[in-house]
């Protein structure tokens, strides 16, 4: 999807239009790119942000209910400082580079997952990249999203999270059936994107839907290359460098076959390296 900079309503309409086309092609799970509604609209950040409950997210919930599907992506979330304390994430407040005023809002890159009209779960990006740290607080939880109707678990990553193998590994160890990454990887990092997306699938023996935006922003451009990858690491569908819809019927049971063939999880020797991973 080519995200129009700071143009929330137009992006929502485009996302719903493309999502409907995807459903008509047989899609049951739809993934939108990172901050699909506005892009990184720092110059109008407060306007770009969604305060829950959000009319924009309600539109997506209604779409998922009307079409009996799952829809995922991310938006900018605005949270009052009082709410931060209420939900028990003071560490985020302390680490934030935003104002420390008691009335100052906090912002997150919020990943959402609607299943047939219900918010199945959400995820706040845990690894903001460079400039993002000047605007976003860090999420403090990495857990799969459980879908009740589909009876499966989805591991959710947002963009820069993809560069940290620990994230996908933790999600896989927690029982994820599928990995989903929503991203805004810019040029000239297409080769990194291609390799990392496949690597997370191969090393965890898990299917991976990796959705990356395309188009231009004021300070960079994006290459797309959204992919659907199976548990063997084989790319089953690739959007290339254009705005389009890709659909593929993923066999989620393939994960179990691959793990029997190459028992990586059984053969791990965590006693040799688990503590070393904490060393800087």
Task: Give the residues covered by each predicted segment.
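Active-site catalytic loop in hydrolytic enzyme cores
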Residues: 49, 62, 81, 86-88, ...
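C-terminal beta-strand edge segments of enzyme domains
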Residues: 144, 213-280
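Short beta->alpha transition motifs characteristic of CBS
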Residues: 38, 45, 112, 123-129, ...
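Residue-level detector of high-confidence beta-strand sites
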Residues: 110, 122-124, 181, 238, ...
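Cys-nucleophile CN-hydrolase/nitrilase-fold catalytic domain and related Cys-dependent amidase chemistry
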Residues: 6-8, 12, 16-116, 186-206
């Amino acid at each position: 999807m080519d995200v129009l900079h700071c143009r929330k309503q137009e992006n929502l309409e485009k996302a719903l239009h493309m999502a409907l086309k995807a459903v008509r092609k047989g899609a049951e799970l739809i993934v939108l790119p990172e901050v699909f509604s506005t892009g990184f609209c720092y110059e109008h950040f407060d306007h770009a942000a969604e305060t829950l409950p959000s009319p924009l997210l309600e539109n997506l919930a209604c779409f998922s209910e009307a079409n009996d599907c799952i829809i995922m992506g991310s938006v900018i979330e605005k949270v009052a400082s009082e709410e931060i304390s209420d939900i028990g994430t003071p560490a985020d407040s302390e680490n934030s580079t935003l104002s420390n005023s008691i009335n100052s809002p906090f912002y997150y890159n919020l990943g959402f997952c609607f299943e047939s009209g219900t918010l199945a779960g959400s995820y706040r990006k845990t690894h903001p990249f460079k400039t993002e740290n000047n605007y976003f607080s860090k999420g403090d939880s990495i857990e799969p999203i459980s879908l009740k109707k589909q009876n499966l678990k989805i591991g959710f990553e947002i963009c820069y999270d993809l560069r940290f193998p620990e994230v996908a590994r933790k999600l896989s160890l927690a029982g994820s059936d599928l990995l989903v990454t929503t991203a805004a990887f810019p040029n000239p990092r297409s080769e990194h994107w291609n390799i990392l997306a496949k690597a997370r699938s191969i090393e965890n023996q898990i299917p991976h839907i990796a959705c990356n935006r395309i188009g231009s922003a004021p300070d960079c451009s994006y290459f797309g290359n959204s992919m659907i990858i199976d548990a063997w690491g084989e790319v089953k569908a690739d959007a290339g460098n254009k705005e389009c819809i890709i659909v593929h019927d993923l066999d989620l049971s393939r994960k179990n076959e691959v793990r029997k063939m190459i028992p990586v999880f059984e053969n791990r020797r965590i006693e040799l390296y688990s503590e070393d991973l904490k060393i800087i």
